[in-house]
């Protein structure tokens, strides 16, 4: 058990594939983060927040949390809409479970110590050429402003540093989403600048603030 920002971090470590040189390694293309998929029974904990890989059985809780949080999520999450359904949840989860096992993206459920679903946090949009990825996160409205997202970002970052060959994790946030920007800052990410018209949300282009965490 290692100390992480004054909280405790607990996990079962997955194997690490070393970074590879050269341009035509097909196994690297299939596993762009350089992460081995032989041990996915990972649980990470910081204080009263736990991150674990998603399971398809999480679909009902995700759907409930999304509808509870529509007002807050819709402006900033392109996948969020009033007709979000259990089928949408299941389809997304099926894809993410496969992506996690293949080392293509790593989405985690944020849960309380008693197992209640709080939100999601993941390492995705992975580009192996420059060994970079993106961290995305959201928390259901009833759990906002309690440090849940900040703890989740810290855990996801440490997991990526210990279990993949990525050297840079970006957090891209719409300029108007000040709450998410505060999470990035509290998690220790560095604000690098504003990218014009970088995010398209519900068919509208938005300027975005770029934050980063590096190895």
What are these model-predicted stretches?
Residues 74-94:
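Conserved GNAT-fold acetyl-CoA-binding loop/helix
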Residues 67-70, 81, 97:
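Residue-level detector of secondary-structure transition/capping positions
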Residues 76, 80, 103-107, 167:
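Short, polar/charged, Gly/Pro-enriched helix-capping and turn/loop motifs at alpha-helix termini
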Residues 56, 67, 83-90, 104:
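Generic alpha-helical scaffold signal
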Residues 98-103, 189:
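Short loop/turn motifs at secondary-structure junctions and domain boundaries
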Residues 1-61, 65-72, 107-215:
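Acyl-donor (CoA/ACP) binding surface of acyl/acetyltransferases
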